[in-house]
């Protein structure tokens, strides 16, 4: 019984940690200066809106990763998104997967 409870707790933690880890990565790389997870657009779009826009696109991860690395302008308004080339590839992959999963 004790091992069953511990297994359930470990499973629950693994379900929560990736999302939190990615939100923490967004904070670490200063993404949250311009973006929120859900809600009204601040400077940049909310991640939930980004996920909706890219939903169903086969190349969504590659497109979004490219936007993060190189920056962009004109997709969400006239305020440019600065390039974030210093974000390590592993962090970038985790961030993009997380952003695209936000509901």
Mark where each language-model region is.
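Axial heme c-ligation environment in periplasmic c-type cytochrome domains
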Residues: 33, 42-54, 66-96
């Amino acid at each position: 019984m004790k091992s069953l409870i511990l297994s359930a707790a470990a499973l629950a933690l693994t379900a929560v940690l990736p999302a939190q880890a990615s939100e923490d990565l967004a904070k670490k790389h200063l993404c949250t200066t311009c973006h929120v997870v859900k809600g009204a657009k601040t400077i940049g779009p909310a991640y939930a809106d980004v996920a909706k826009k890219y939903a169903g696109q086969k190349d969504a991860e590659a497109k979004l990763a490219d936007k993060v690395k190189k920056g962009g302008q004109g997709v969400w308004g006239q305020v440019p998104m600065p390039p974030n080339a210093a974000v390590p590839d592993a962090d970038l992959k985790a961030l993009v997967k997380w952003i695209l999963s936000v509901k």
